[in-house]
């Protein structure tokens, strides 16, 4: 990889998994449904993409706390990049 590893990782994963913003929005919908079903509550809004991304940063941090693997840090930085952009858009 010749450029920024985070941007290259995002581009590479986008080719495999598709549009990350759409994916993160869909994950938010799925997680909202799971939370509502499990707790028997109704949320006013689905989890926004930026919150999904921040939760994924926490997931990667927990993995990194267990054992070093560079991928955890690269992915966490990518999720933070998405979260910053999406939260700015959300206002």
Enumerate the language-model features and the residues they cover:
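Intrinsically disordered, low-complexity regulatory regions
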Residues: 1-91
């Amino acid at each position: 990889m010749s450029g920024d590893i985070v941007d290259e990782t995002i581009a590479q994963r986008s080719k495999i998994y598709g549009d990350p913003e759409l994916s993160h929005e869909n994950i938010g919908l799925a997680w909202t449904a799971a939370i509502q079903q499990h707790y028997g509550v109704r949320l006013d809004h689905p989890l926004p993409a930026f919150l999904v991304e921040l939760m994924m940063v926490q997931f990667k941090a927990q993995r990194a706390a267990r054992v070093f693997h560079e991928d955890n840090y690269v992915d966490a930085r990518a999720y933070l990049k998405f979260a910053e952009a999406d939260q700015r858009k959300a206002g």
